[in-house]
């Protein structure tokens, strides 16, 4: 069938060239195939239609220069060879091809080879070709079609690779020149770039980021100058909370907004609160570390009526000496059996050191080493404090004059057999 069609086309082409020398007036009228205003549908093309079309084509070529008349046969072959039917329905049968080609006969453009000129490109004719003509077309011819119209058409058809087109059996893609919306193979969503790549993605309203300030960059922290900081600190010393009127005045003075001043004062109050809290925590820690030594409050004050007293005679005596003169230490209350044991003692350590004899008389300086030796090993606290029970010979060895024979308490505390007062010189009052 294909061979027969080729032979028929060649015979018709010869007829057209022979009749091109004497154009007839019957073909000077507009052919119904070119009538784009009417809505009549052209039926399937017959053999006579093809012959009349080629005759009409030759008559149109006769209107141009003599160069076109000499090469009329060549132009006729090119025009038939390079025109594609854009509305084929993927069938190789000639009957289906004729039926489908009539649907998109109107509103089409001429696609010719590079050998033609611009004046010939402006002419229009229906797209009528056959499968054999399309298969003979090479890749270079397809690229030249796009260049003939100023590069408006890409080499690939609707973004589909040429390899994919060649692998499809029994199908032929539509020409890029055909833009009729009634075409069956036309896809409005097909990309215009080769390889199926989009030139630019479409933008829709739902693709925008939600939010009034979505396009704005987040504002950074406000940097205050030294002058602004000093003025704000000065104002904070007088008023920790600003009124609206004063805040407006500061905003005009310091070239800041009211919101910036308000935030600065909030941060400053929070900073002050943290500083006060830190000072309180330090004071609590110091209170827990302080014991009897260096304390303003004597730990013996809480033990006035405690059962630790040997004779239960109160807090005057050794505890007063320990709290005042020594300033702490082991504050267990010890005293003699008689009240006279406390007469020579006082809460002031200095007075005790001056009046150790209990009678107001002077006393010699006690040797420090001998004092420690005499009171280091004491059988009991009571014997240490009560001079009546002590051995007078041992006391005299320490060069201490006991005028009235009263207790020999010299301002030291013997706790658990060890002296707690060291390095003290006892001079006369």
From Swiss-Prot:
Recorded GO CC terms: nucleus
Biological process according to GO: anterior/posterior pattern specification; regulation of transcription by RNA polymerase II
Subcellular location: Nucleus
Signal peptide positions (record): none
Biased composition (Low complexity): 1-26, 169-182
Molecular function per GO: DNA-binding transcription factor activity, RNA polymerase II-specific; RNA polymerase II cis-regulatory region sequence-specific DNA binding
Keyword presence, Chloroplast: no
Main location class: nucleus
Role this protein plays: Sequence-specific transcription factor which is part of a developmental regulatory system that provides cells with specific positional identities on the anterior-posterior axis. May play a role in midgut regionalization.
Organs and tissues of expression: Restricted to the posterior 16 midbody segments. Expressed in the dorsoventral muscles, which arise from the septal mesoderm and lie in the groove of the intercaecal constrictions.
UniProt cross-references to Pfam families, sorted A to Z: Homeodomain
Family, per entry: Belongs to the Antp homeobox family.
Tree of life domain: Eukaryota
Keywords linked to the UniProt accession: Developmental protein, DNA-binding, Homeobox, Nucleus
Protein's UniProt name: Homeobox protein LOX2
Compositionally biased tracts (Basic and acidic residues): 124-143
InterPro entries noted in UniProt: Antp_homeobox, HD, HD_metazoa, Homeobox_CS, Homeodomain-like_sf
DNA-binding region residue numbers: 217-276
Disulphide-bridged cysteine pairs: none
Keyword Ribosomal protein set for record: no
Lineage, uppermost ranks: Eukaryota, Metazoa, Spiralia, Lophotrochozoa, Annelida
Annotated stretches, region: Disordered: 1-32, 117-221
């Amino acid at each position: 069938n294909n061979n027969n069609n080729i032979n028929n086309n060649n015979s018709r082409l010869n007829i057209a060239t022979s009749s091109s020398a004497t154009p007839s007036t019957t073909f000077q009228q507009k052919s119904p195939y070119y009538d784009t205003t009417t809505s009549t549908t052209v039926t399937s093309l017959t053999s006579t239609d093809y012959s009349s079309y080629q005759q009409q084509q030759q008559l149109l070529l006769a209107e141009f220069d003599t160069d076109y008349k000499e090469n009329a046969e060549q132009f006729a072959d090119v025009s038939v060879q390079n025109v594609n039917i854009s509305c084929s329905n993927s069938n190789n049968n000639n009957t289906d091809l004729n039926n489908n080609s009539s649907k998109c006969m109107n509103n089409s453009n001429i696609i010719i080879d590079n050998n033609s000129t611009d004046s010939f490109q402006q002419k229009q004719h229906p797209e009528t070709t056959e499968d054999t003509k399309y298969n003979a077309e090479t890749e270079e011819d397809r690229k030249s079609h796009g260049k003939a119209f100023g590069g408006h058409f890409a080499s690939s058809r609707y973004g589909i690779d040429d390899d994919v087109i060649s692998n499809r059996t029994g199908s032929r893609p539509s020409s890029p020149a055909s833009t009729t919306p009634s075409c069956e193979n036309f896809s409005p969503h097909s990309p215009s770039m080769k390889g199926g790549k989009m030139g630019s993605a479409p933008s829709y309203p739902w693709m925008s980021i939600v939010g009034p300030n979505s396009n704005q960059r987040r504002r950074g922290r406000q940097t205050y100058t030294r002058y602004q900081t000093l003025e704000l600190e000065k104002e904070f010393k007088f008023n920790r909370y600003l009124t609206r009127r004063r805040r407006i005045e500061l905003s005009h003075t310091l070239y800041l907004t009211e919101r910036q001043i308000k935030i600065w004062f909030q941060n400053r109050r929070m900073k002050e609160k943290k500083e006060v809290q830190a000072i309180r925590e330090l004071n609590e820690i110091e209170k827990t570390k302080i014991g009897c030594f260096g304390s303003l409050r004597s730990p013996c004050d809480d033990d006035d009526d405690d059962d630790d007293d040997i004779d239960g005679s109160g807090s005057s005596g050794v505890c007063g000496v320990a709290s005042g003169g020594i300033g702490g230490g082991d504050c267990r209350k010890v005293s003699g059996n008689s009240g006279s044991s406390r007469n020579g003692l006082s809460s002031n350590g200095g007075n005790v050191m001056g009046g150790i004899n209990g009678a107001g008389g002077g006393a010699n300086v006690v040797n420090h080493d001998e004092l420690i030796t005499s009171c280091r090993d004491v059988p009991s606290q009571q014997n240490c404090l009560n001079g009546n029970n002590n051995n007078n010979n041992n006391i005299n060895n320490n060069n201490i004059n006991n005028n009235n024979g009263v207790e020999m308490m010299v301002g030291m505390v013997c706790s658990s057999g060890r002296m707690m007062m060291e390095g003290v010189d006892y001079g006369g009052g």
